Amino acid sequence: MAFLELDHVSVVFPAVQGLLSARKSAPVVAVDGVSLSVEKGEILGLVGESGCGKSTLSRTVMLLQKPTEGRIFLEGEELTALSASEVRKRRPDFQMVFQDPYASLTPLFTVYATLKEALQSRRKRTFAQTRDDVAELMEKVGLSPSLMRKYPHEFSGGQRQRVAIARALAPEPRLVIADEPVSALDVSIQSQILNLLIALARDLSLTMIFISHDLSVVHYIADRIAVMRKGRIVEYGEADKVFSSPSHEYTQALLAAVPRL
């Protein structure tokens, strides 16, 4: 069995009563029967336009959203069968890197405080151990430990995203989900963050789901690609094959939108 396996996962949001109307809206099928797998140490790219269900699927994998149907397995264990208390215990196993690093970091926390909190979620440490572990995390993401007493507003966008990545690594997660982690950054910085994620995945044997609307970015970082449209996976395969010879018309449209030099 694969490291992570999704078996016919669906997420349906129920109809909502309008404030000014007696009519209910139709139920929203955000994720529709998705089945896919991720191998240990692999980067899976999940690509699709806004509103296709990528973020809902990622929240479901992280146990933040309960699926309406289907099952999710991590190393053979059915996550969807866990109780609420068991889910809370597993939170450190799943970490996320968000699109906007400034919004995802607490502005009143120094880097040290942010990383300390993330480290303590896995196990308690002495002051000296915490200081050393914070320094090590910062070095892993290409930041000088001398910056650990600074606040988010004192960093550039790329540096803030490095802090966010360090925070995700702190609890030693089993799975990292990066949701559009470079789309809010300058083009000149995007490749640096992508190369950092590739190096971390290789050096730490990280398993990662990388989410983006940009097929070229996903092709650059991913081992395999899953293309999502209207809640469904319409294409799934090796990254080079999907990028060079897409079989589905939607993937072909995404490829046609990639800028050519």
Predicted features, each with a name:
Residues 62:
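Helix-to-loop junction immediately C-terminal to a conserved catalytic motif
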Residues 70-78:
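Conserved ABC transporter NBD signature motif
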Residues 78, 128-146, 255-256:
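Conserved ABC ATPase "signature" region
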Residues 151-155, 159:
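Conserved ABC ATPase signature
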Residues 236-237, 245:
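ABC ATPase "signature
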